[in-house]
Every structure is written in structure tokens, then in C-alpha cells.
């Protein structure tokens, strides 16, 4: 793994920390039934039927995914090359799901949650980082 690839994985780990903090906060608020302070219409989004899957908060599922990405990105940074594939196998679906959830906010709920958008931005950033790392690896061949 080149120095650039390690830096990309380190940045991915940092982005995963941001996503984990965000989704962890939303999960705790959801489970406690607390109000989320937000400048946008978070209550409409977080109170919608799309906020949980089978009683499990979507943010909680995201938090678990961010823990997986964080762990794999750290392992990749430490030289475990196969961990890069784990990062990619989580980051790409996370970005796709996030795009779907943005669609739900825009066209079904007609409200946006800044915290949810932050998580989506983190997921999309992770996917871009993974694709960048992949392109660097291909170019090195």
C-alpha cells in the first residue's frame, strides 16, 4: 500500500468517526425519545415511519456500519491490505442507502434533517475516498 493509499484510509477512518458521532447521537436521542435540536425540520424526518426499520433506528444501523468502516480503515492504515476491501464493501452500499434516504427526505417527507444530511455526506465522502483509493491502486499496476 502506498503512502497516498494509507492517507486515504486514515481520512476514511476520520470521516467514519464523524459519521459515528452523528449517528450515535441520533440513535441515543431516538431511543430516549428526546427532542433533537436542529435548525431544519429534523423532527419531521426523525419522527417519520422511515426513521426505523423493524423498531431499530436507521441511525443505529448507520452507527454499526460506521464502526465497521472505522475498524477496517484503521486496519488498512496499519498495513492489512485486505481491510481495504472491507471498507469498500461497506462504504459503497452506505452511500447508496444514504442517497435513497435523501430521496425520501426530499420527495416523500418533504423535510430535511441536518444531522441526517451530515451522515449522508460522510457516507458519500467514504465512497469517494474508496473509489479514489481504487483508482490509485489501478494506476500503480
Regions found by a protein language model. Name each.
Residues 1-141:
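Membrane-interfacial helix-loop segments of redox and metal-homeostasis proteins
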Amino acid at each position: 500500500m502506498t503512502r497516498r493509499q494509507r492517507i486515504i484510509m486514515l481520512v476514511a477512518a476520520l470521516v467514519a468517526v464523524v459519521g459515528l458521532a452523528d449517528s450515535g447521537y441520533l440513535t441515543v436521542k431516538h431511543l430516549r425519545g428526546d427532542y433533537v435540536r436542529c435548525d431544519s425540520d429534523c423532527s419531521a424526518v426523525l419522527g417519520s415511519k422511515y426513521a426505523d426499520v423493524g423498531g431499530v433506528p436507521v441511525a443505529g444501523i448507520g452507527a454499526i456500519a460506521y464502526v465497521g468502516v472505522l475498524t477496517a480503515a484503521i486496519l488498512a492504515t496499519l498495513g492489512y491490505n485486505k481491510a481495504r476491501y472491507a471498507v469498500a464493501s461497506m462504504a459503497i452500499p452506505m452511500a447508496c442507502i444514504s442517497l435513497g434516504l435523501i430521496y425520501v427526505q426530499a420527495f416523500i417527507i418533504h423535510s430535511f434533517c441536518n444531522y441526517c444530511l451530515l451522515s449522508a455526506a460522510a457516507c458519500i465522502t467514504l465512497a469517494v475516498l474508496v473509489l479514489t483509493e481504487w483508482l490509485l491502486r489501478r494506476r500503480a499496476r
